[in-house]
Amino acid sequence: MSGALKRKRSDEVAWSRRRPVKKPVRRAPPPRAGPSVRRGLPSLQIQTLVAAGDTMITVPSGGICSLIGTYARGSGEGERHTNETLTYKVALDYHFVATAAACKYSSIGIGVCWLVYDAQPTGTAPTVQDIFPHPATLSAFPYTWKVGREVCHRFVVKRRWCFTMETNGRIGSDTPPSNVAWPPCKKDIYFHKFCTGLGVKTEWKNVTDGKDGAIKKGGFYIVIAPGNVEFTCHGQCRLYFKSVGNQ
């Protein structure tokens, strides 16, 4: 009887009155940015620049500099709808073919391709010498060029690639003798590059064209230099961009 009426200790009473601790409920992580999440976001616009036939590009010694962010004002897929554009990606698919004059000699040339951002455009297209000042004795060695010290605040190299071309002293119309096989060489090559994360912002003047004079800030150029093997360029340059800012 005395055992049944035994009083509980005070610490046992306090322990029995404690509320059970609830474990925190784990919430599922937010869904990743898949197709269902991205469905509401506007897709990137695409502009394609074609170099073929009459628009074929000839790359002489010393190189060329050409505007690729050429977004005219309009409502089309490859046109800007506002006064600002953001270029995110660039895909280059070019076929380089050594000229007949270059094929007459046996040589190896290392060419370079740059994507250059112009922070302070002047209304006219910059030349290769404006961006990469160099003496005439280095015209055949573009891999040694650097952005000029006086214009380094204006021109920013976003991407840079080197490529190699070769000639063996024979042009395409030459026919080898029946008992001789000419080894192949890289007198024509496929040049493919796809770059992302560019983030090139361009502000446009209140005009409708997309040329150099229409750019207020942020020109986007491609520079190609052939080394000592001049060539022609055929193919496409595709730009992925968005129209942002005010109408």
UniProtKB/Swiss-Prot annotation:
Organism superkingdom: Viruses
Classification via Pfam families: Gemini_coat
Ranges of biased composition (kind: Basic residues): 16-26
Coiled-coil residue spans: none
Family according to the record: Belongs to the geminiviridae capsid protein family.
General function of this protein: Encapsidates the viral genome into characteristic twinned ('geminate') particles. Binds the genomic viral ssDNA and shuttles it into and out of the cell nucleus. Plays a role in protection of the genome from degradation, virus acquisition and transmission by insect vectors, infectivity, and systemic movement. The CP of monopartite geminiviruses is absolutely essential for virus movement.
Organism of provenance: Panicum streak virus (isolate Kenya)
Stretches for region Disordered: 1-39
Subunit structure: Homomultimer. Interacts with the movement protein. Binds to single-stranded and double-stranded viral DNA.
GO molecular function terms noted in the UniProt entry: DNA binding; structural molecule activity
Residue ranges of the motif Bipartite nuclear localization signal: 1-28
A GO biological process held by the record: viral penetration into host nucleus
Protein name stated in the entry: Capsid protein
GO cellular component: host cell; host cell nucleus; T=1 icosahedral viral capsid
Principal location listed in the UniProt entry: virion
Keyword line: Capsid protein, DNA-binding, Host nucleus, T=1 icosahedral capsid protein, Viral penetration into host nucleus, Virion, Virus entry into host cell
Source lineage: Viruses, Monodnaviria, Shotokuvirae, Cressdnaviricota, Repensiviricetes
Localization per Swiss-Prot or TrEMBL: Virion; Host nucleus
Xref: InterPro entries: Gemcoat_MSV, GV_A/BR1_coat, Viral_coat
